[in-house]
Swiss-Prot record:
Its main location: cytoplasm. The gene is MB. GO terms for cellular component: extracellular exosome; sarcoplasm. Monomeric heme protein which primary function is to store oxygen and facilitate its diffusion within muscle tissues. Reversibly binds oxygen through a pentacoordinated heme iron and enables its timely and efficient release as needed during periods of heightened demand. Depending on the oxidative conditions of tissues and cells, and in addition to its ability to bind oxygen, it also has a nitrite reductase activity whereby it regulates the production of bioactive nitric oxide. This is Myoglobin. Belongs to the globin family. Nitrite binds at residue 65. One of its GO terms (molecular function) is metal ion binding. Residues 2-148 form the Globin domain. It catalyses: Fe(III)-heme b-[protein] + nitric oxide + H2O = Fe(II)-heme b-[protein] + nitrite + 2 H(+); H2O2 + AH2 = A + 2 H2O. Pfam families: Globin. It is found in: Cytoplasm, Sarcoplasm. Monomeric.
């Protein structure tokens, strides 16, 4: 299920816009994740107290974690599918330490898609959306495979 060169170009083009404001995008992605799927908060001890949108908006820790999430994802996307060295340590911590279910990776992928669509509607048309969706699916599938290697069924 690899992406074509053109699809990777679309993914990395829109990702450049995300990287221009990692803090803003990351913060919004996590807020969207926690608001749309409140059960995901249970996996984040330091964010469990954030129950309202205002609390989430004011959280510097949430903003910092958003930068971390999108920075790691960006490193993986830039490898254009050849991401074994970047993916393995991420999968290991998410499988063995954080125990993040694959379903939650789907949820954050949805949040990423929504935030990009809201912030960059003019640059995130159907082809770009399809390419990004495919890239995020590749990421999730490869994470799920690694989870199994680490004995986590997620």
């Amino acid at each position: 299920m690899g992406l074509s060169d053109q699809e990777w170009q679309q993914v990395l083009s829109i990702w450049g816009k995300v990287e221009s404001d990692l803090a803003g995008h990351g913060h919004q992605v996590l807020m969207r994740l926690f608001q749309d799927h409140p059960e995901t908060l249970d996996r984040f001890d330091k964010f469990k107290g954030l129950k309202t949108p205002d609390q989430m908006k004011g959280s510097e820790d949430l903003k910092k974690h958003g930068v971390t999430v999108l920075t790691q994802l960006g490193k993986i996307l830039k490898q254009k599918g050849n991401h074994e060295s970047e993916l393995k340590p991420l999968a290991q911590t998410h499988a063995t330490k954080h125990k993040i279910p694959v379903k939650y990776l789907e949820f954050i992928s949805e949040a990423i898609m929504k935030v990009i669509a809201e912030k960059h509607a003019a640059d995130f048309g159907g082809d770009s959306q399809a390419a990004m969706k495919k890239a995020l699916e590749l990421f999730r599938n490869d994470m799920a495979s690694k989870y199994k290697e680490f004995g986590f069924q997620g």
